[in-house]
Amino acid sequence: DLFWATVGGMGLTGIIVSVTLKLRRIETAYIRVQYHRTRNLDETMRLLEEEDQDYNYSVAWVDGQAVGGSLGRSVLIRGNHATVDDLSPQQATQPLEFAHRRTWTVPPQVPNFVLDRFSVRAFNSLYYRRFRQHPVNSIIDYDRFFYPLDSLREWNRLYGKRGFIQYQCVFPPDTSRAALVEVLSRLSKGKIPLCLVVLKRFGAETGLLSFPMPGYTLALDMPMLGTPLLSVLHELDQWVIRQGGRVYLAKDACLSAEAFKEMYPRFGQWQRMKTEMDPQNLFSSDLSRRLQITGVDD
């Protein structure tokens, strides 16, 4: 129906003028966090599958430059909402408030070499070794937990004038491991600096154009290296299709219309709903025209 065509529908069914949300009741503005360093992708996936149900939030920071037996080594970052009893005496006096963190601003005109393969490899190694092999627990405020990059204002300037590309894909459970190994290996062989790599598990899909499906999603941030990078990403698109996965439209910048239709099998059902509700295609976007969702891009 219209609801499920709109959820995940990229704003193409119209303007949402009213939303009712069901919220989770919490006692504090803090998160009880566990950091756990893993040796490789197999250990990362095993812990996510065995222990995800114990946490409200779960994500893995992946060292995208690691290769060989260390491929996919990660830092698991998992958290639950803290109760008042979890807080220090000082925090417990005002459990729904916290001290705002100090921020730094990246200056303009950062040289492109600041984020190359060598600097990214060095940073990843230092960040990975910052954590111990056994789990470490901590209490942090929700702002630091959910928005870790916000300490660095204008962080996108680190990529220089070339900018950056975000690529996120999802794979079903039966193909996830092999698919993740292929993606990480192919990008590493292509000498592409993977500046930020995040791995999560997904539940069931809902909307007709929803990105999630049961399985694993991998999100990657990379410097925009022009044609060489785009060629690799187009190859990855075909790999994603063969593994039964799809690419996240909200972050997409280079998917083809043909690949999109293969990745989203419920597109025809969504399109019929769109035609019924908006026969003149009044609601469209650069993305929808490029992917020929609402017409052909000029």
Predicted regions: what they are:
Residues 1-298:
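Noncatalytic alpha-helical scaffold of FAD-dependent oxidoreductases
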